[in-house]
Amino acid sequence: MPLYQTLLRADITCLDYSPDMMGQAREKAERMGLQNVQFRQGDVGALPYEDSSFDIVLSLNGFHAFPDKEAAYRETFRVLKPGGTFCGCFYVSGECRRTDRLIKKVYEPMKFFTPPYETVQSLKVRLEGMYADVQLGNVKSIAWFVCKKVKYAEKMEEGHHE
């Protein structure tokens, strides 16, 4: 969170399905003296926010756990302002067999990870179909991405339709 400490005029909203994770985030923010952070327990598949509410949507290690990934992608797109940035990272399958086996044998039974999973290629296709200026990479089984929600006029010029 050190970067967040420099964003004194930013309004930061943290949402997690797990009350335990929200508690940990709240404690960390308090230790750091952050004042501009709101915490809310909720489901990314049904975000409790108006359309075009956020300049940035950041998802760290979430999409591999979400039970309804399609709803999560739709909702993050919906709440992001045109011209806003969607970024994050999460597990992708097919990059390291050892990690794939660990996920299947350990994390899925514990309900920490929920199939189906993206591959690097499927994530690229998905993000390029929804966003512009897609930057995507991976370090073994963790993919990272940064992309922009284009403004409607820009999308129309490119021949895409929302």
What are these model-derived regions, one by one?
Residues 1-46:
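Class I SAM-dependent methyltransferase SAM/SAH-binding core
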Residues 11, 83-85:
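Short glycine-centered segments of the SAM/dcSAM-binding site in methyltransferase folds
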Residues 20, 67-71:
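Short N-terminal helix/helix-N-cap motif within the alpha/beta-hydrolase-1
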Residues 45-57:
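A short acidic, Gly/Pro-enriched loop at the edge of an enzyme's catalytic core
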Residues 55-68:
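A short SAM/SAH-binding and catalytic strip from SAM-dependent methyltransferases
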Residues 70-82:
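A short glycine-rich, Lys/Arg-flanked "PGG" loop and its adjoining helix->strand segment in the class I
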Residues 87-145:
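C-terminal alpha-helical "lid/dimerization" subdomain adjacent to the S-adenosyl-L-methionine
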Residues 145-162:
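C-terminal lobe and adjacent flexible extensions of AdoMet/dcAdoMet transferase-like proteins
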